[in-house]
């Protein structure tokens, strides 16, 4: 798949951040978990009741979404319709389900 232009990538990344936000809100409501979501530009911050955070942001030069969680730092690159971890091949929403569940202290399934 050829690289996208910066504007194409930013539009795609914004759409994905919107989807992540809606998915996290729905999962948190279903599990009665307290997760505060804030966004500034291409950076999304999820703050949990225990004070921990997950930061998700787009990196246009690398055409990746980066996730910083208590479990570590992760880079996801678009592969068709999915975002795949550049190190272990894991899918973004499966990975986020694990990170969010760990930090929320409740089982949440995203995506």
From Swiss-Prot:
Spans traversing the lipid bilayer: none
Record Gene3D superfamilies: Frataxin/CyaY
Xref: Pfam families: Frataxin_Cyay
Gene Ontology annotations of biological process type: iron-sulfur cluster assembly
Protein name: Iron-sulfur cluster assembly protein CyaY
GO MF entries: ferric iron binding; ferrous iron binding
Family, per entry: Belongs to the frataxin family.
Secretion signal span: none
